[in-house]
């Protein structure tokens, strides 16, 4: 089994490209991770997701602990076998969903108590329990339990939240079962305050995680402020470890973040947009519901190799989406995931050539 490692092969200014080696294979960086919240990427077969070029998927601890439960998944051979995906899987810690989906959640030093959004059952999620669930799932990359600081937050609010995340990170690290080829990432918090981001980074770097995530962004602060934070936040982290920007997925945001030193991304944008009839292309977004596509016999993108573009016209996709056929969601999602993987491939090629990014989609 391979050791977990991150090898940077090319660098242009702050942008890096390389390979992360894991127990479940290699992943190219910069990487975009499709979101498979409940053990599936919506409207896609796992093997179809692989065909888009994805090297890694994201799963969600909160949803999987509720249904079908981590204990059931481990009895069935782990998440990889359960969903027929043999490449790396990263699972988030569940904290963000607990705090955003549960109507009744209480944050204490111990963890977060909450009621299930499904049936109201009461649960307690702690750093130790979150780490245990991710271990049972067989996650390749486990995320430390954190509090995602809401925006806006005062300096004192952000400081209190960041310090709690640091204490939880210590507990998460102690609970993590180290195995060859597996990793745990710490999550940097501190809102939009440079002093807090620096302190959070120092505290978590001391714990020697295998990688680090920049959390608490893309929560309403806007691109300009997000980029301002990213102008300095990655510089506080080790050069030789992966950096993951959580929940960011707009093409222009990805390009801007890569140029500031970020290596990994995840977002529901390509899948959710696809199900809603929006396609991403190099020339901008296409709302396939628009009546102007009813008689358009051309593909979404002439040089895209996804099934939607190879085999079907915009008129056919328009028809499927307008009448609510499942195939419409499948083809639009397949195209969007292919577009995002093509975008990452293009980004990696520019870094290898030492070129500035001259595109934003």
Swiss-Prot record:
Catalytic activity reported? 7-aminomethyl-7-carbaguanine + guanosine(34) in tRNA = 7-aminomethyl-7-carbaguanosine(34) in tRNA + guanine
Q: Where is this region: RNA binding?
A: 247-253, 271-275
Xref: InterPro entries: ArchSynthase1/Queuine_TRR, TGT, TGT-like_sf, tRNA_ribo_trans-like
The cofactors it requires, by name, are: Zn(2+)
GO BP of this protein: queuosine biosynthetic process; tRNA wobble guanine modification; tRNA-guanine transglycosylation
Cofactor details (free text)? Binds 1 zinc ion per subunit.
Gene Ontology molecular function, alphabetical: metal ion binding; tRNA-guanosine(34) queuine transglycosylase activity
Its GO CC terms are: cytoplasm
Write the record's keywords in alphabetical order, separated by commas: Glycosyltransferase, Metal-binding, Queuosine biosynthesis, Transferase, tRNA processing, Zinc
Protein's UniProt keywords contain Transferase: yes
- UniProt binding sites for substrate: 92-96, 146, 189, 216
Q: What is its EC number?
A: 2.4.2.29
* Pathway, per record: tRNA modification; tRNA-queuosine biosynthesis
List the active-site residues: 92, 266
Give any Pfam family that matches.
TGT
UniProt cross-references to NCBIfam families, sorted A to Z: Q_tRNA_tgt (TIGR00430), tgt_general (TIGR00449)
Outline the subunit composition: Homodimer. Within each dimer, one monomer is responsible for RNA recognition and catalysis, while the other monomer binds to the replacement base PreQ1.
- Give the family, as the similarity comment puts it: Belongs to the queuine tRNA-ribosyltransferase family.
> What is its biological role?
Catalyzes the base-exchange of a guanine (G) residue with the queuine precursor 7-aminomethyl-7-deazaguanine (PreQ1) at position 34 (anticodon wobble position) in tRNAs with GU(N) anticodons (tRNA-Asp, -Asn, -His and -Tyr). Catalysis occurs through a double-displacement mechanism. The nucleophile active site attacks the C1' of nucleotide 34 to detach the guanine base from the RNA, forming a covalent enzyme-RNA intermediate. The proton acceptor active site deprotonates the incoming PreQ1, allowing a nucleophilic attack on the C1' of the ribose to form the product.
The protein's name is Queuine tRNA-ribosyltransferase
What organism is recorded for this protein? Rickettsia peacockii (strain Rustic)
| Gene (UniProt) | tgt
């Amino acid at each position: 089994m391979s050791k977990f490692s991150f090898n940077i092969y090319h660098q242009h200014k702050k942008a890096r490209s390389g390979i992360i080696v894991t127990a479940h294979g290699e992943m190219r960086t910069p990487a975009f991770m499709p979101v498979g919240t409940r053990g599936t990427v919506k409207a896609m077969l796992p093997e179809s997701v692989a065909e888009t070029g994805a090297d890694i998927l994201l799963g969600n601890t909160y949803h999987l602990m509720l249904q079908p439960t981590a204990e059931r998944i481990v009895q069935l051979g782990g998440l990889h076998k359960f969903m027929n995906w043999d490449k790396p899987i990263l699972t988030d810690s569940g904290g963000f969903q607990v705090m955003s989906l549960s109507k009744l959640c209480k944050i204490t030093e111990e963890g977060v108590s909450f009621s299930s959004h499904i049936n109201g059952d009461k649960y307690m999620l702690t750093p130790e329990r979150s780490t245990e669930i991710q271990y049972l799932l067989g996650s390749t990359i486990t995320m430390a339990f954190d509090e995602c600081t809401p925006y806006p937050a005062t300096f004192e609010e952000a400081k209190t939240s960041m310090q709690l995340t640091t204490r939880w990170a210590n507990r998460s690290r102690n609970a993590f079962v180290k195995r060859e080829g597996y990793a745990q990432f710490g999550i940097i918090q501190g809102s939009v305050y440079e002093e807090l981001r620096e302190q959070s980074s120092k505290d978590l770097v001391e714990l020697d995680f295998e990688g680090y995530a920049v959390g608490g962004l893309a929560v309403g602060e806007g691109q300009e402020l997000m980029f301002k934070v990213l102008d300095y936040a990655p510089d506080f982290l080790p050069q030789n470890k992966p950096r993951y920007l959580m929940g960011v997925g707009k093409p222009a945001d990805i390009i801007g973040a890569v140029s500031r030193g970020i290596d990994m991304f995840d977002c529901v944008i390509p899948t959710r947009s696809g199900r809603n009839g929006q396609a991403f292309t190099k020339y901008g977004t296409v709302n396939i519901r628009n009546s102007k596509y009813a008689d358009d016999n051309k593909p979404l993108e002439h040089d895209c190799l996804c099934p939607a573009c190879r085999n079907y016209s915009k008129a056919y996709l328009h028809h499927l989406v307008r009448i609510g056929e499942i195939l419409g969601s499948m083809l639009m999602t397949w195209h969007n995931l292919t577009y995002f993987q093509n975008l990452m491939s293009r980004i990696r090629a520019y870094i290898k050539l030492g070129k500035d990014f001259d595109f934003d989609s």
